[in-house]
Amino acid sequence: MKIIVSRGLDLSLKGAPKESGFCGKVDPAFVSVDLRPFAPLPLGVKVSPGDQITAGSPLAEYKSFPGVFITSSVDGEVIEIRRGSKRALLDIVIKKKPGVSQTKFSYDLHALSQKELLEVFKKEGLFTLFKQRPFNIPALPTQSPRDVFINLADNRPFTPSVEKHLSLFSSKEDGYYIFVVGVQAIAKLFGLKPHIVSTDRLSLPTQDLISVAHLHTIAGPYPSGSPSTHIHHIARIRNDRDIVFTISFQEVLSIGHLFLKGFFLGQQVVALAGSALPPSQRKYLITAKGASFKDLLPQEIFSSNDVSLISGDPLTGRLCNKEENPCLGMRDHTITILPNPKTREMFSFLRLGWNKLTVTRTYLSGFFKRKRVFMDMNTNLHGEKRPIIDSEIYEKVSAIAVPVAPLIKALETQNFEEACRLGLLEVSPEDFALPTFIDPSKTEMFAIVKEALIRYAKENVLTPL
């Protein structure tokens, strides 16, 4: 199936890394295992500071679903278990042993039964790689998905491409073969053919995949690479019984690597990007999963008060300035550095804005079609917070047929019945990144949707055994 997305916004941001290769490998002294994505679920920590661990060691367990573990991908020593507000678990910091873990595992994918395969996924931390719709929560082992979607079309700003992720391996062919094994494992685990969504320019091993997966291509501006867009156009979620699991290309590589090579894939490709980074520092690196920012960034950038440190892309990433020793998030492959101006732009309301980005034609640039211009973005809001406006401008950048303003209003009043009627079950917070970005009222739609999905999920599916 070929999907063409017309709505969205092609964000051309300054600060992208150079496309010409990599700038080496970095073996960080410290890494962390990010537990923030599991906030909707109560976790039981299985380690203490000072414990020696190896790749595959269980670090935390789902309390409500015993036997599902979050595991380490490196060898080392547990240094700290960090907690936030109300003692919520944030991450587990590990002092990493130099080099790649040599802890070996022996699993024969073809010999394992479906039940045995599920136990392997739960024990080795592979099940925690899946996310579940509705609600955009960690996948639950008690749920049987209607479909599984594998995303090879991620086009968030500065996010490394599929080709960049394949640089982890000796050849592109080797990387694709590992991916095929991962897809085979997913197909066997759930007894279905997953949906693989990629871009036209990718040369996938079609002959190896066609028997175990449905292949689709998608084209269009961001958010054409969002899983919500893929699900909406291929197999839409109609009610809360339509369970769909989603997983990224990189996470499928982790699954395939364990079954084919017998080792945890402890490395990842990271993009260092953002207009606050000097051009010479904008690059791709191969480093350990969850690497410390301090090991990846120049000291003058890491310690600067004039920049914003973001784990992830500039639209959906986590702001890390207030963290003592920030590390990459669980699903993040980008570190974004943006300017953090301390003063307002002089007479900004009187400027013509020829080089300003606008969707609402606030500036002169909105009235002319020009060649691609790269925008130099910073963290200024360019105005104060105002009441939300009921406008169709949000739908211009939304790739799914969900009325943005009415849905946000329903969520703010906790009218979940109305919110579900408007499409809450289909969405994730990422779907509101662009509406938040262009919103004249400065409403934090991303945060509103995220909190509402967690709250509604706790009332409906996240109940203890």
From Swiss-Prot:
GO terms for molecular function: oxidoreductase activity, acting on NAD(P)H, quinone or similar compound as acceptor. It is an enzyme of class 7 (translocase). PANTHER family: NA(+)-TRANSLOCATING NADH-QUINONE REDUCTASE SUBUNIT A. Composed of six subunits; NqrA, NqrB, NqrC, NqrD, NqrE and NqrF. InterPro entries: NqrA, NQRA_2nd, NqrA_C_domain, NQRA_N. It comes from the Bacteria. Its EC number is 7.2.1.1. Keywords: Ion transport, NAD, Sodium, Sodium transport, Translocase, Transport, Ubiquinone. GO terms for biological process: sodium ion transport. Belongs to the NqrA family. The keyword ATP-binding does not apply. It catalyses: a ubiquinone + n Na(+)(in) + NADH + H(+) = a ubiquinol + n Na(+)(out) + NAD(+). NQR complex catalyzes the reduction of ubiquinone-1 to ubiquinol by two successive reactions, coupled with the transport of Na(+) ions from the cytoplasm to the periplasm. NqrA to NqrE are probably involved in the second step, the conversion of ubisemiquinone to ubiquinol. The keyword Translocase applies. This is Na(+)-translocating NADH-quinone reductase subunit A.
